[in-house]
């Protein structure tokens, strides 16, 4: 497969390294913040992998969709535009797969957290909270992965109804609120933890990324999957769609 990469930051460089070391894939082009992006920028590509920033992704989206090349997006921070993006993808007849985190380990972790949140739902003595820890260069907080985890918890645990990102002064959290804490420190690639607590027990479920290769490898793997189904089944996809098919 031939890939066009949009974004030449740390994740873009890691994806390029995975592709170059694969022995079977190649890079058609790399577009950075100095590139003028048009539909023609993606000619000769089998898939696009986007790791940029919110504004760049939204600005480049029309050209990517117009090109007809399937797009895998790891850029985060645009969740408020997700319904608009879904609509544009469907109207274009193209394909886009979005995930805040392409690590297979993280996605297995997320499903484990969701199942744990479902299991404790009938038992009032158990409470649940979530934290994430990333390097100081990460711009968005809480991370897209943490917010995805929070949404999954809320979807299966009716005792939690809203997400609280920060607590100020003497404000106390209420029983129906799910706290999602964020820490920016050092050079941590990414650590996500769910805490389940009662007066009698504590359950801790955690995922700690050792490097960025897991994210990059997952992005390449999902791009292959998306390209294979793009012609017959275009549309908007998530990591759940990929995993559901792989685990079927």
UniProtKB/Swiss-Prot annotation:
GO BP: any one term: diaminopimelate biosynthetic process
Signal peptide: none
Annotated GO MF terms: 4-hydroxy-tetrahydrodipicolinate reductase; NAD binding; NADP binding; oxidoreductase activity, acting on CH or CH2 groups, NAD or NADP as acceptor
One term under GO cellular component: cytosol
Catalytic activity: (S)-2,3,4,5-tetrahydrodipicolinate + NAD(+) + H2O = (2S,4S)-4-hydroxy-2,3,4,5-tetrahydrodipicolinate + NADH + H(+); (S)-2,3,4,5-tetrahydrodipicolinate + NADP(+) + H2O = (2S,4S)-4-hydroxy-2,3,4,5-tetrahydrodipicolinate + NADPH + H(+)
Entry binding sites for NAD(+): 32, 74-76, 99-102
Class of this enzyme: oxidoreductase
Free-text function comment from the UniProt entry: Catalyzes the conversion of 4-hydroxy-tetrahydrodipicolinate (HTPA) to tetrahydrodipicolinate.
Name of the featured protein: 4-hydroxy-tetrahydrodipicolinate reductase
Species of provenance: Chlorobium limicola (strain DSM 245 / NBRC 103803 / 6330)
